[in-house]
Amino acid sequence: MKIALVCPASLPATQFGGIVFLSIDLAREFSEMGHDVTIYTSDLDFANGPTKFNKDLPRLEKFEKFKINRTHTWFSVKLYFVNPNIYKQIKNDRPDIIHTIGLRSFQSLMAWFVSKQTNIPLVVSDQGGLTTHPFLKQSGIFFKLVYKIQNFFIKCIINDSSAISAANEYEKEIFLTFNKNSKIKIIRNGINLKTLVSQENFKQKYKIDNKFILFVGRFSKSKGIETLLYACSIIKNELKTQNVSLVIMGVDFGYQDEMLKLINMLKLNDNVIVIKNPPRDDVIAAYGQSEFLVLPSHWELSPLVP
């Protein structure tokens, strides 16, 4: 079977988060089963920031047993990446089935257009962006209007889909608010343990002598880093614990400057190690050597950490 996986970002932009890992894992598993799998995506690369696109990335790249088809992003608004040529690429390749991930994306809109025009079955998944995202409540009038327009198209995509894959019962209920008759199957997110092996000595590389607690994620207000730093301050000042460090690994999504100021204000510079834009291998190595991982997010749908 010829399978098209459609998503806003893919390799090498691992810092984008769960959608990247979900699509890669699906592509890996489907291709191992003998299917012809292509990921259609943007050319986001995260080399210099969360909205940096790279024309030098291969347009078509073979990775393991599947392919990644990248088209250039003309412009972006927040995490909405507009790469119109993705429509032509999917349509010309004539897949047997299209599976799109991340319904607030331009890429899902294009996948729906192709499906509707060619009668190719459409499977949809999301990864936390439908109704629970804090941007929906915190944004100004313009973006609230944009989200309402998006909701119209999301409802169309859901109504026309052949099947919906939800990560858990909570996400299933969110989908049902758009269409009570949706064909929903709960397929929980998994982790490929083979990808969680690293030869890197993380503590040696970053000169960490203490035991450390680990946070991995976007530097975003919604990830709860502020709460984590105040907790770290309590551990240091009230519990008088000096031999444990906090390692924060991730990429800036608008909160980095405020986070660094808070670290300085709480006098945690000697206790907190911030690693910006870490290589994936370093992240995996950190998982193995940390005492434990913390997930202080204000909300999560079905987190793909690690």
What would you call each of these model-derived segments?
Residues F21, K211, F215-K236, D257:
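A conserved mid-protein helix/loop that constitutes part of the nucleotide-sugar donor-binding site
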Residues N277, A285-S290:
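Short alpha-helical donor nucleotide-sugar binding micro-motif in glycosyltransferases
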Residues M1-K55:
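N-terminal subdomain of nucleotide-sugar transferases
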Residues Y170, G190:
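Carbohydrate-associated surface elements
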Residues H298:
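Aromatic "clamp/platform" in nucleotide-sugar-dependent glycosyltransferases that forms part
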Residues F113-Q117, L130, K144-I164, F178:
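Membrane-proximal helix-turn-helix segments that form the acceptor-binding/catalytic region
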